[in-house]
Amino acid sequence: LQDFPQAWAETGGLGRAKCQVPIIIDLKPTAMPVSIRQYPMSKEAHMGIQPHITRFLELGVLRPCRSPWNTPLLPVKKPGTRDYRPVQDLREVNKRTMDIHPTVPNPYNLLSTLSPDRTWYTVLDLKDAFFCLPLAPQSQELFAFEWRDPERGISGQLTWTRLPQGFKNSPTLFDEALHRDLTDFRTQHPEVTLLQYVDDLLLAAPTKEACIRGTKHLLRELGDKGYRASAKKAQICQTKVTYLGYILSEGKRWLTPGRIETVAHIPPPQNPREVREFLGTAGFCRLWIPGFAELAAPLYALTKESAPFTWQEKHQSAFEALKEALLSAPALGLPDTSKPFTLFIDEKQGIAKGVLTQKLGPWKRPVAYLSKKLDPVAAGWPPCLRIMAATAMLVKDSAKLTLGQPLTVITPHALEAIVRQTPDRWITNARLTHYQALLLDTDRIQFGPPVTLNPATLLPAPEDQQSAHDCRQVLAETHGTREDLKDQELPDADHSWYTDGSSYIDSGTRRAGAAVVDGHHIIWAQSLPPGTSAQKAELIALTKALELSEGKKANIYTDSRYAFATAHTHGSIYERRGLLTSEGKEIKNKAEIIALLKALFLPRKVAIIHCPGHQKGQDPIATGNRQADQVARQVAVAETLTLTTKLEETNLTTNKYAYTPEDQEEAKAIGAILNQDTKDWEKEGKIVLPRKEALAMIQQMHAWTHLSNQKLKLLIEKTDFLIPKAGTLIEQVTSACKVCQQVNAGATRVPEGKRTRGNRPGVYWEIDFTEVKPHYAGYKYLLVFVDTFSGWVEAYPTRQETAHMVAKKILEEIFPRFGLPKVIGSDNGPAFVSQVSQGLARTLGINWKLHCAYRPQSSGQVERMNRTIKETLTKLTLETGLKDWRRLLSLALLRARNTPNRFGLTPYEILYGGPPPLSTLLNSFSPSDPKTDLQARLKGLQAVQAQIWTPLAELYRPGHPQTSYPFQVGDSVYVRWHRSQGLEPRWKGPYIVLLTTPTAIKVDGIAAWIHASHAKAAPKTPGPETPKTWKLHRSENPLKIRLSRV
């Protein structure tokens, strides 16, 4: 303290870096000031941090300010004392400032650069290190906080003038600044090693004298540069010191008792978050725990938030085992990067374990204990391949300690031969390339001879050690789930079957089916639930073929690579890795894969053979595969259908029919005669089918063809059967077919009604955008306004269809000239339904009516005017040769405003009470023209108005008072889908009708109103077998009723 007073915080006061410029904090481009009020603070806490705030104000570290930024101050109580320290919550500020790449050293490998020969140490901890760096004035207001101190007259905001604690970039900024200031010391004193971790310094020297000299020069350098060390925490020239939680002595390192005690006092976790905290704290010490990954394996399953948290005995055992391993943690040697390393590796049950060592005389001294859990893919490999994955993982981890020094790898397996010649059935090319690039680095990594017993294999393991073996021979003999499973056909097979699964989209629904055939007959076929994938269908078909071949010799062909690989290779891999993917998630089609693996052992002998799909040849394999594909597609359309019969044996005419009395009466009515031999009713050589069989036949034929009523009736007439009242049954079946209802054309015809109009000019307008081609000077559209009373039209060229343009023309053109509209009608275009347009209407009190979607007739007046304007512009363009159609728009509007309607009146005459003064354009003005008497002119206008308004009254006669369509609330309807593409259905539904108007309906599930012409009634019953009526029963309880089928 006396020799270097400027280097110590106790004698030199607060430090300030003399060679560092003020730091400027960069904000993100979109950052805005954030202001968070101060949290409530107890009186004890306020009084506890008040001395610190007062001291910082006196030292100039804090200053008063007024800033739009504000973050709260948190008082944190120091453990074991009654003292508080102020901590600022800068999380919101951190979100709004630019990130910089962190260059702070990694404490995991920082000591790897320290030579074990330097056994004298000095440890210095800089006091208030961040406050040594000044903060630029323009950046100081970012860190403002509220503070009140009535005794000093302070009530407002304070901010820091130095780099604050809690700021995310403070460690990196200070670490870089201190490195720059100590560069000269490192170059001038090579006899010592100086390690720096932010504000913690470690100086190591080979002798006590060198350590003392280096410490003096370091203290002088710190004092001259403006830094201050804490004398209370200093450890000067000692052979045993504590640094970064480690005890260093004689080239070795231990865990400090404080760190071990911290882990030992952690209570059992109560939730996944506490499990992760424990594993993180204990994981910092994993270098000292042999087999850490194996001990902690049961706890990793509890770290997932999605899984239920259940603390069991195995978890408690793993929890206590980790604590016990820490209490007996050994001493590890410091890595000497001037000497080579040896890594002993072993793998058991998916856990890689290793011991990194260096020679110390005749002994191998441990430097680190490494352990890691293999990923689910590697865990499913044979042991001779798992060791390759384990070696790659541990070599990568050891590189943090070896820092590129030569490394010798020793395992119980012939690892180098495995890496160079790996069976491709187990490992992908990408993963193999990664392993080879990592392990076949001959300049750095060498492989020692396989050793069955090494320090890694002697680590605690739950099973006995393996005996010596030949890895390549073991891999060659490793097979799939069943050892005798072949991929070539058996010459003595009892049968050869072909399997296939089909999955495709039909009417918006994914349908699927599976089949097993022998090339001539259907062995088994079944429709699968909607949404079943093609891969799942293939697995189901192959599994069923194996089950039906129980106890037999079978050749089974499949064109699915997925099913073939699952049976031969992947199934065994899935079984080894616990049916998990490489990401640790459950595999798809898990149940089907398990069923397939079980069914593989049912046949006495089996060969699963892959064949190309969709071949056109006539050989048995191509024919059988095509038949399997066709049958699978056919059964996919059925709701629930399972076929196990042979096609040739199906003969409908041999069945005996049961005729009910009603069926017999109908047969007699059409003149049929009972055949005494077959007991069938026949007419003209055709069998009269009973109603039940006839209905089933019609349903099946319609399911195959989906023909209309007339065509289906003609098709039935060509069969050997006669169906009484066939038209009624066909109508019943086709009307209940949901597929036909969704696809067939046809809608409800709605007669034209009366369009709502204004009762005087300027009251009711219809507006619309229409595109005009070719575009000119960026103008693409016309915004058209039509007065529904007079037919008067206004049109304005625009570049875009925007709500801003609609509002602008209403306020600047329509309102000043014609008055405030009461009603505006339009389609559902974005410019009309936007908040701008609708907000303007609400503000002005305008009733904005949106017409039915995809119903241009609802806006018929303005739609017809669009056509008129564009046709007129086309003609004028051809006559004049002008390309700028905007210059011709006024002439087109003149024509539209003076075209007579069906009553012989023009919009101009209706609006102004007379024809336009076109005739005066040809006559010159004469001063001798008599002046018009005003009174006579007004009387003439009155007469003209009476003459004009009489025919206009015809437009306002009430229309048909009844609803023009048959829909009622509660009915089921199909709604036309206007956006159907490709093979999608034209109609969606059915939907329930909720509300009705004379021209539109509102249905459940669709927000917009639907015009009645865009809907059609759905069948009242889903099928002919469903009862048609329900009966209502009262009960004694007035709030309870009972429904029953009739």
Swiss-Prot record:
Domain Integrase catalytic residue range list: 757-915
Post-translational modification: Specific enzymatic cleavages in vivo yield mature proteins.
Record's keyword terms, sorted: DNA integration, DNA recombination, Endonuclease, Hydrolase, Magnesium, Metal-binding, Multifunctional enzyme, Nuclease, Nucleotidyltransferase, RNA-directed DNA polymerase, Transferase, Viral genome integration, Virus entry into host cell
Gene Ontology biological process: DNA integration; DNA recombination; establishment of integrated proviral latency; symbiont entry into host cell; viral genome integration into host DNA
Molecular function as annotated in GO: DNA-directed DNA polymerase activity; metal ion binding; nucleic acid binding; RNA-directed DNA polymerase activity; RNA-DNA hybrid ribonuclease activity
Residues reported to bind Mg(2+) 1: D500, E538, D559
Keyword Transferase: yes
Domain Reverse transcriptase, residue spans: 55-248
Residues annotated as domain RNase H type-1: 491-637
Chain residues that bind Mg(2+) 2: D500, D629
Enzyme Commission number(s) of this protein: 2.7.7.49, 2.7.7.7, 3.1.26.4, 2.7.7.-
Catalytic reaction equation(s): DNA(n) + a 2'-deoxyribonucleoside 5'-triphosphate = DNA(n+1) + diphosphate; Endonucleolytic cleavage to 5'-phosphomonoester
Entries under InterPro entries matching the protein: DNA/RNA_pol_sf, Integrase_cat-core, MLVIN_C, Rev_trsase/Diguanyl_cyclase, RNaseH-like_sf, RNaseH_domain, RNaseH_sf, RT_dom
Record's function text: During replicative cycle of retroviruses, the reverse-transcribed viral DNA is integrated into the host chromosome by the viral integrase enzyme. RNase H activity is associated with the reverse transcriptase.
Family as reported in the entry's similarity comment: Belongs to the retroviral Pol polyprotein family.
Name recorded for this polypeptide: Pol polyprotein
Species of provenance: Feline endogenous virus ECE1
